[in-house]
Structure formats: C-alpha cells, structure tokens
Amino acid sequence: MKNLFSKVSILFSWVVLLMLAVILCPHGALANVKPAAGGMLFVGIGGMIVNASTLNNIFVNLKTTFNRCFDATPTTWNKIAMLVPSGTKTNDYKWLANFPRMKKWFGEKAVKALAAFNYTVTNDDFEATVEVDRNDIDDDELGIYAPQAEMAGYSAKQLPDEIVYDLANGVFTKTCFDGQYMVDVDHPVTDANGVVQSVSNKGTAKLVCTTQAGAIASLGASRTAMKKFTDDEGRPLNIKPNLLLVPPALEDIANVLMNNDRLDDGKANPYKGTMEVLCDARLTSDTAWFLLDTSKPIKPFIYQERKKPVFVQQIDPQAEDVFMRKKFKFGAEARAAGGYGFWQLIYGSDGSV
C-alpha cells in the first residue's frame, strides 16, 4: 500500500510540473517539443526552447548570413598577386630563380637546373570566432549576432587582401627568392657575357604631378628602369608596367598622372592612360609608391592557399564550454600564407627625395 501511495504521489508531482510548464510556456509550445535523439532539452521560460534542432536552425541562418556577406565582399588582391594552391605545410619557390624561356635550338637542349636559393613559404592558421551566449538564445536575443556573422564573412573574404597588402608594406625589408629584399638596389643578375651585375628595382623619388620634368624624373625614370630588366642570359624580359599602386595620400597625384591631359605646369602629360591606378588604405607609407607588371602568368606577389576560409561552428549542447560557461561558438577558419614572386615585376620608390 505504501509503495502504491508513493508511486501515485510521484505521478501526481509529474502531472503538476507538466501543467505548470504548459501554462508558463507561451502558446503551449512545450506540447510539440521533444528532445533530439541523444541530445539535451533546455527550456527557456517565456523565450525560445533550446534543443539540437533549434541550435541547428540558428546556426544554419548564421552560416547563410556569413556566406552571403562573404560572396558580396569585393577584393583586389588578385590584381597584383597570383594564387598558388598548397597541398603541404610548406611550399618551395626556388623555381622562381630559373624560369625557362624559348630560344633557338642548337645541338642539345639547354636544361635549366634549379638554383641553390632557398625560398620557402609556410602556411599559417587564421581564425575569426564569435561566442553565442546560451542566455541570448533562451531570451530570443539573436539579432545581435547577425552583424557579427556578416563581419566574420567580410573578414574571411578579405584575408587574401590582408596578406598581400602586408607583403607590399614589407617589400623594402623582406627578402625574395634571390636572398635580397623584394625591392632593393643590388639584385644579382648575370649579363650576356656571364658577368654578374647588380640591378636595382628601388628608387627614392617622390611621385609628383606638378611639372612635366618632375613626372619624367620620377614616374618616367621608374618605367624606363623596369623596361630594361633582363634575364640571366642578358635578354630583355619585355616588362610592361601597367599598374600604379599607391596609398591614399598619393591617390590624387596618381589619378592626375593617369587621367589629365596636362600637368600642373600646363605641359602635356605623357603618362595619361598608360597604367591603372590601384589605391589601398592598408598601404602604411604615405610616400612610397610602386609600379607593377601584372600582365604575365606570374605576378609580383603570391597568395598561397592551403585551406579556403570556411564557416565553422561548435553547437554540441554537452560540450564543456556550454556546460561550464553557456557558450556556443561560430566563426571562420583558413590556412594560407603569402610570398614574393619575380622582383623584376615591381619597381618601388620610398618617396624620400
């Protein structure tokens, strides 16, 4: 009899609890909610019911927002850099030193051996992570996360830009495949007689549009120097500078040089329409400017991609972070790196003189 009374009491208690839950949960939503298979059920009184299905729907929406913003975000890195897919931790670029060119065939073929230069680029890990507090899901306060998902998508799409323009900022201080700085005064090049010469792709002139003479001494001299670059057999490389890369401080000057019929002194502008102007606010020097030849298969900069940016999430209700801190997570992950291509395809001036 006591056992029967005990069972009846327990059953009555469960009935009372169920009735209270139905009354307190709006619109009788609890009647249609079941725990996901193998999952936990959280009930947010007066708010959203948190279970595996709810979480999945929430993060599907966040992923959709992420992808929409990712696809809509413009980039410019591919104007000045080439994409190199990576299948390993590190890529070796010593082949840049000995790129073969067609020539007349006399006797045996001249086989280009790989040079002894050691130029490798190791992939780095990148991430952007957002925490979602379980209370915000309980309280149906998820609107604050849509802008964060958009920014995560924007940031992920901009990763190649960030890497490539950081490379541009480092051309005067970071080495390329020949062991010299990417923009330097003494790149070793063998001439037609087999003698090693020092070749410069670095200037100091300010970019100016005030006079024709000043424009010729800065922009014109740099263009001429690039066009005279030769390969390791003394043959002209046929460099054609077609892009003028500048920081915001030099954008107006660059546009005058590329668009105006006449310069500030009233004389004819010999450089109108000769190059595209590319301005990026991530260039940190207000005086440095660069000429690039981007018309060839190889570009001045390399974007090495091991893993494209992807949306990731951690939504297991039983994960330690959820149990201990009530935190779910979403964000983006990628593996990539950057490096320098042919130094002959860029001419840089620090604008110091």
Where are these regions (language model features)?
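Short, charged/polar micro-motifs that form catalytic or ligand-binding hotspots
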Residues: T88-D92, A116, T120, N135-A149, ...
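Short alpha-helical segments and helix-capping/turn motifs at coil-helix boundaries
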Residues: L62-T65, L114, F229, I315
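N-terminal alpha-helical "arm" segments
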Residues: K2-F5, L30-D71
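N-terminal secretory/membrane targeting signals
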Residues: M1-N32
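Assembly/oligomerization interface modules of large self-assembling protein complexes
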Residues: R68-D124
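Sequence/fold signature of self-assembling virion shell proteins
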Residues: C25, N32-A36, F42, I49, ...
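Charge-rich, acidic-biased intrinsically disordered regions
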Residues: G170-T190
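Long, contiguous amphipathic alpha-helices that act as assembly "spine/axial" helices in icosahedral shell
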Residues: Y119-C176, L244, K326, F330-A332
